[in-house]
């Protein structure tokens, strides 16, 4: 299964999250998931909120259009981004 798939006007992205990183960045593939490093700690939903904000900024959409479908409490997540306005170059190569 691919890390990123298109479903109509949305992208579904399987992620592996690295919390408490030195900076926010899309790292690349990690197995069959896209690895994303974020600076927020995995405490009280801070990492999820920070991840949503980071991805919304990268794809130039409102935070409400970035939804965590699976994996609220773990490092392995599935995210849906509806109507992405921009697709970062380091993500575009993995879309199927």
From Swiss-Prot:
InterPro entries, per the entry? DUF167, YggU-like_sf
Please provide one cellular component term from the Gene Ontology annotations of this protein: cytoplasm
Which Pfam families does the record associate with it?
A: DUF167
UniProt superkingdom: Bacteria
S-S pairs:
none
Q: Which family does it belong to?
A: Belongs to the UPF0235 family.
Alphabetized PANTHER family for the sequence: UPF0235 PROTEIN C15ORF40 (PTHR13420:SF7)
UniProt-recorded name of the protein: UPF0235 protein ECA3630
Organism, as annotated: Pectobacterium atrosepticum (strain SCRI 1043 / ATCC BAA-672) (Erwinia carotovora subsp. atroseptica)
């Amino acid at each position: 299964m691919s890390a990123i798939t298109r479903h109509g006007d949305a992208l579904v992205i399987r992620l592996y999250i690295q919390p408490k990183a030195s900076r926010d960045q899309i790292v690349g593939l990690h197995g069959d998931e896209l690895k994303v490093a974020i600076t927020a700690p995995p405490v009280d939903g801070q990492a999820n909120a920070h991840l949503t904000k980071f991805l919304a900024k990268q794809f130039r959409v409102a935070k409400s259009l970035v939804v965590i479908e699976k994996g609220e409490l773990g490092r392995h997540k599935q995210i849906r981004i509806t109507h992405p306005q921009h697709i970062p170059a380091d993500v575009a190569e993995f879309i199927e």
